Design a protein with these regions (language model features):
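Long, terminal "pre-/pro-" and other extracytoplasmic accessory regions
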Residues: 1-166
Length: 166
């Protein structure tokens, strides 16, 4: 089904956070994450003025840290870039094609079935791992149920937890 394929794309997209999933990309992200004055949850809240947050991640883009939140509003998708020092919206770009559009479509499909918001899922994951910092939260479907794949940085270790959204 289209929804099943969308869910697979969404979960596969989670692995794209580290570009080529190389150690260098992970090391850069771990190092740069310390420079952020806000957490992922604050970025999610800041993006809400641009629609329903459907995924969020810190990433390294051209050697610089970036906080990106995908939102859905009135059937359209947007990438909201958040200033990781102030928590203010820097830029809003429509997502209309390509891999980003496919990812946003699958994430939106998963969130449409969710009873829990993305921020609530992140808060719950953090509460179960007190010292960890959230790197990303990307929803998808697992066995027909909406689940958020949440990447946590605990010390120098990255780990992924699956947080049910229903």
């Amino acid at each position: 089904t289209v929804l099943g394929l969308a869910a697979l794309v969404g979960l596969a997209d989670q692995n794209a956070i580290f570009a080529d999933d190389d150690d260098e990309g992970q090391e850069a992200l771990i190092k740069l994450l310390d420079t952020s004055k806000i957490n992922l949850q604050q970025g999610i809240v800041a993006s809400e003025q641009q629609g329903q947050p459907i995924s969020a991640k810190f990433e390294v883009e051209e050697g610089k840290l970036q906080l990106s939140v995908y939102t859905a509003k009135e059937g359209k998708f947007f990438e909201v870039l958040i200033n990781y020092m102030t928590g203010k919206v820097l830029k809003v770009e429509p997502i209309t094609e390509g891999d980003d559009f496919a990812a946003a479509t699958s994430q939106s499909a998963a969130m449409s079935m969710a009873k829990t918001s993305l921020k609530e899922a992140v808060d719950k994951a953090v509460s179960q791992s007190a010292k960890a910092r959230v790197v990303s939260a990307v929803p998808g479907l697992k066995d027909g149920h909406p689940v958020a794949s949440i990447v946590l940085l605990d010390g120098e270790q990255l780990k992924t937890v699956q947080q049910p959204l229903d």
